[in-house]
Amino acid sequence: AEVLMDFPQLTMTLPDGREESVMKLTTLVA
């Protein structure tokens, strides 16, 4: 998780096909 926090502008494609920002995902997980 710490590594992801260094790249807040990255996006991640979710299994359902949506793209979410890594920062948003880490916020949801946290």
From Swiss-Prot:
GO molecular function, one term: ATP binding
Sorted UniProt keywords: ATP-binding, Hydrogen ion transport, Ion transport, Nucleotide-binding, Translocase, Transport
Domain of life: Eukaryota
Catalytic function, reaction form: ATP + H2O + 4 H(+)(in) = ADP + phosphate + 5 H(+)(out)
Family under the similarity heading: Belongs to the ATPase alpha/beta chains family.
Role, per record: Catalytic subunit of the peripheral V1 complex of vacuolar ATPase. V-ATPase vacuolar ATPase is responsible for acidifying a variety of intracellular compartments in eukaryotic cells.
Note: Two separate genes encode the catalytic 70 kDa V-ATPase subunit in psilotum and equisetum.
UniProt subunit comment: V-ATPase is a heteromultimeric enzyme composed of a peripheral catalytic V1 complex (main components: subunits A, B, C, D, E, and F) attached to an integral membrane V0 proton pore complex (main component: the proteolipid protein).
Record protein name field: V-type proton ATPase catalytic subunit A isoform 1
